[in-house]
Amino acid sequence: MAEKEESVKLLGFWASPFSRRVEMALKLKGVPYEYLEEDLPNKTPLLLELNPLHKKVPVLVHNDKILLESHLILEYIDQTWKNSPILPQDPYEKAMARFWAKFIDDQILTLGFRSLVKAEKGREVAIEETRELLMFLEKEVTGKDFFGGKTIGFLDMIAGSMIPFCLARLWKGIGIDMIPEEKFPELNRWIKNLEEVEAVRGCIPPREKQIERMTKIAETIKSA
């Protein structure tokens, strides 16, 4: 009996770091998938049906399985398609990759986006506090090609989709050079390495379009 053909669909949004990181993993592993672009202000009935709880992207549909939340989707992809592993095999290194991923999506996103834009304590204070957090990642990637070592891994996908290809576009749009090379030589080297990875290049949002979008979001938050 012939094996049932696999079906992989990803509901995403071009500017979402959360769906872009899932695309990176699928491309890296060579998994054929159908990409369905969502218009987030006008969510499709399919998105509302598949993710009625959060009504957000990404949503991965693998045959009859529906998966939500980018970190969990990345782990599912890694365990389902074994080639080109993205999570460390060592239990401690795996736990630390998860720790830093949560640090990025919780602390750096919160401080480097909404808190910075609102700047209730002053913009310069918010900038320095954000840089203090980024310095932890600077130290973590020192001496490595990628956070994952010699090859791109789970943490590179989380950090890459969020920092250089999302938040940095916001910072650029509001006139902040958040990661100057003289302060963050290792992070800047890592970003250059990341941009050379084929699976990543195809998932980087258009720069000027992203800057324009992030700047508009910042203006909305600031005036709220």
UniProtKB/Swiss-Prot annotation:
Its EC number is 2.5.1.18. Glutathione binds at S16, P17, N42, K43, K56, V57, E69, S70. It comes from the Eukaryota. Residues 90-217 form the GST C-terminal domain. Its main location: cytoplasm. Pfam families: GST_C, GST_N. GO terms for molecular function: glutathione transferase activity. It is found in: Cytoplasm, Cytosol. It catalyses: RX + glutathione = an S-substituted glutathione + a halide anion + H(+). Keywords: Cytoplasm, Detoxification, Phosphoprotein, Stress response, Transferase. GO terms for biological process: glutathione metabolic process; toxin catabolic process. Induction: By acetochlor, metolachlor and 2,4,6-trinitrotoluene (TNT). Residues 6-85 form the GST N-terminal domain. Belongs to the GST superfamily. Tau family. This is Glutathione S-transferase U1.
